């Protein structure tokens, strides 16, 4: 309503279409100075305005017609500022939330567009550890956001389920495997087997190296040279059998894969994550043959001591990329090429996002460059969503921490904190479930507090606090709003007299609620969860300030009903934001 009025008047003054001017209107942070502002230079992208921006701002301010909506116009540098009817603004915001409820702030901008989000993607032979947490929750946040904005969204888990390490795993399982332990916890057991066999293989390699050094130095070797195939040789041969379609080798590999996926799904359920497709490197073997031939036909392959490489040194200085080993087996990037083509042909997409750590930046630059050289025009529709590392996640001995252990530990710690308030604890229907949700909220919000591309320090004590900017604090704010509704003695009245919300705290809370659509757009444009998290903390703080003075209990009915609507709207928006972040908003805690 207010932005539309501003756009309408500016359209007359500039002869720029009102809907284009709407894109340039910003909500201000300093409400004492203005409620909305238009940076005049931004208008130049639609039409070259004659005159200096600061002079134009002064000129436009003098010509704005004041009315029920616009109550003041002024210029500050290149900005044209507007003061609006705040009482009317509060009413309009709350009426929109009443009408749209959880859909407030959401648009249908994604209608008719299909996106694939590939995320989480653990390696079956390696632990599902804390490092996978960021990819999993960032990808889940993106899927939730895209769904809210009407995109057709495909969530994909591209399992690392192919490569020489599976040969190594098969060799290791034959030697160290336990059926009982495999069925009890396939992920942990396969990891332990992998560590054991890999350690043994490394000792063999060290012995070979030592033998060669002793011979070169002309001394008697301390141990004879191993003449039987090494563990790595056996693993390579096993993987070659897999690539050649050997039924026995594939049956063992498939069993490891299937059991691992069942366990992964348990963990994903706790994380509130669901995948439409469980894909994997193994599923693109046929496509690899076709794409490899295309690389040959386009003369992109070069021989390098029996292996095949692609030269990407010009123009982007991306070096030479190995795409086939001397024994004819493929590499990760070869499978990524085939996977991208397969998805475009068989699923289709307008955009595809890879949510993978920033250590893989160079890999994705190489992948996208190769696809471009193969003349795949849709290569421009691929985006690598990178992120920094989580520090402080290893044990004191430097060993890896499993993600499930982190979730169990946060749940246990949260349960202990909850038990400190016996009265509230007794009111909770399923305390273990609630502790799990609050624990997950602590982990997720600590992660999302940091900018996506930054490293951050994992801090158990800080993240579990119910005060300060933490996950438990946001859940507490939501639960408190639910409690206020239950205990107020009033019902939600959509026709409440909202003109009674005249206090500064009511204005501040309503205006914060009204910023949600803008925040959603900013979050979508940046694909940055910290933007949404920062806003939710602002909203929770505004609610807390309002609680101090805007009471409902024992107030006059009309005033109480208006305040009830204000708090109800805050609850709707807070809940909406938490759900986009992948969290279940709690009603009691």
UniProtKB/Swiss-Prot annotation:
Cite the InterPro entries for this sequence.
aa-tRNA-synth_I_CS, Arg-tRNA-ligase, Arg-tRNA-synth_N, Arg-tRNA-synth_N_sf, ArgRS_core, DALR_anticod-bd, Rossmann-like_a/b/a_fold, tRNAsynth_Ia_anticodon-bd
UniProt-annotated stretches for the region Interaction with tRNA: 469-483
Annotated L-arginine binding lies at 121-123, 132, 332, 336, 360
Q: What's the EC number here?
A: 6.1.1.19
Location in or out of the cell: Cytoplasm; Cytoplasm, Cytosol
Residue stretches spanning the membrane:
none
Enzyme kind, highest EC tier: ligase
Concerning SMART domains, the annotation shows: Arg_tRNA_synt_N, DALR_1
Instruction: Determine the domain of life of the protein's source.
Output: Eukaryota
Single GO cellular component term = phagocytic vesicle
The record, for SUPFAM superfamilies, names: Anticodon-binding domain of a subclass of class I aminoacyl-tRNA synthetases, Arginyl-tRNA synthetase (ArgRS), N-terminal 'additional' domain, Nucleotidylyl transferase
The listed location of motif 'HIGH' region is 121-132
Q: Does the keyword Cytoplasm apply?
A: yes
The record ties this protein, via Pfam families, to: Arg_tRNA_synt_N, DALR_1, tRNA-synt_1d
Q: Which UniProt keywords apply?
A: Aminoacyl-tRNA synthetase, ATP-binding, Cytoplasm, Ligase, Nucleotide-binding, Protein biosynthesis
Show the CDD domains listed in the entry: Anticodon_Ia_Arg, ArgRS_core
The family annotation for this protein states: Belongs to the class-I aminoacyl-tRNA synthetase family.
Q: Which NCBIfam families match?
A: argS
PANTHER family per record: ARGININE--TRNA LIGASE, MITOCHONDRIAL-RELATED, ARGINYL-TRNA SYNTHETASE
What is the protein's name according to its record? Probable arginine--tRNA ligase, cytoplasmic
Source taxonomy: Eukaryota, Amoebozoa, Evosea, Eumycetozoa, Dictyostelia
């Amino acid at each position: 309503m207010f932005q539309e009025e501003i756009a309408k008047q500016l359209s007359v003054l500039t002869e720029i279409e009102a809907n284009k001017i709407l894109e340039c209107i910003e909500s201000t942070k300093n409400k004492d100075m203005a409620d909305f502002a238009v940076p005049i230079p931004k208008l130049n992208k639609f039409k070259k305005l004659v005159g200096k921006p600061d002079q134009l701002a002064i000129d436009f301010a003098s010509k704005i017609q004041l009315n029920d909506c616009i109550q003041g116009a002024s210029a500050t540098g290149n900005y044209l500022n507007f003061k609006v009817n705040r009482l009317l603004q509060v009413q309009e915001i709350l009426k929109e939330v009443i009408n749209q409820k959880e859909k407030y702030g959401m648009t249908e901008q994604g209608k008719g567009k299909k996106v694939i989000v590939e995320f989480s993607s653990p390696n079956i032979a390696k632990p599902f550890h804390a490092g996978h947490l960021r990819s999993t929750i960032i990808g889940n946040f993106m899927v939730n956001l895209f769904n809210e904005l009407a995109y057709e969204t495909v969530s994909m888990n591209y399992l690392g389920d192919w490569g020489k390490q599976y040969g190594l795993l098969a060799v290791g399982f034959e030697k160290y495997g336990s059926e009982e332990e495999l069925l009890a916890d396939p992920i942990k057991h396969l990891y332990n087997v992998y560590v054991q066999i890999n350690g043994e293989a490394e000792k063999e390699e060290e012995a070979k190296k030592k033998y060669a050094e002793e011979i070169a130095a002309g001394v008697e070797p301390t141990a004879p040279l191993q003449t039987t195939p090494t563990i790595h040789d056996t693993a390579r041969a096993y993987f070659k059998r897999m690539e050649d379609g050997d039924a026995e080798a594939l049956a063992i590999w498939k069993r490891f894969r299937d059991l691992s996926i069942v366990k992964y799904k348990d963990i994903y359920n706790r994380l509130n994550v669901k995948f439409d497709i469980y894909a994997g490197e193994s599923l693109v073997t046929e496509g690899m043959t076709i794409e490899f031939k295309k690389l040959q036909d386009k003369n992109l392959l070069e021989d390098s001591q029996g292996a095949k490489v692609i030269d990407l040194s010009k123009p982007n200085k991306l070096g030479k990329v190995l795409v086939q080993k001397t024994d004819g087996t493929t590499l990760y990037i070869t499978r990524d090429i085939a996977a991208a083509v397969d998805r475009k042909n068989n699923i289709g997409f307008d955009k595809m996002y890879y949510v993978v750590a920033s250590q893989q930046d160079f890999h994705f630059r190489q992948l996208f460059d190769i696809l471009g050289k193969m003349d795949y025009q849709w290569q421009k529709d691929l985006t690598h969503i990178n992120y920094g590392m989580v520090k402080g996640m290893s044990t004191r001995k430097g060993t890896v921490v499993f993600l499930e252990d982190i979730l169990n530990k946060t749940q246990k710690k949260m349960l202990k904190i909850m038990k400190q308030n016996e009265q509230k604890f007794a009111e909770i229907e399923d305390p273990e479930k609630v502790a799990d949700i609050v624990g997950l909220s602590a982990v997720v919000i600590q992660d999302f507090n940091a900018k996506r591309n930054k490293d951050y320090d994992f801090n158990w004590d800080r993240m579990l606090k119910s005060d300060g900017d933490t996950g438990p604090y946001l859940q507490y704010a939501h639960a408190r709003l639910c409690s206020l509704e239950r205990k107020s003695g009033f019902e939600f009245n959509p026709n409440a007299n909202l003109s009674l919300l005249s206090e500064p705290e009511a204005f501040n809370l309503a205006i914060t609620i009204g910023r949600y659509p803008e925040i959603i757009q900013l979050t979508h444009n940046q694909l940055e969860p910290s933007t949404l998290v920062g806003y939710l903390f602002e909203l929770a703080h505004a609610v807390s300030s309002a609680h101090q003075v805007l009471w409902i209990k024992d107030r006059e009915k009309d005033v109480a009903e208006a305040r009830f609507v204000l708090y109800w709207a805050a609850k709707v928006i807070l809940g909406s934001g938490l759900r986009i972040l992948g969290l279940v908003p709690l009603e009691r805690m």
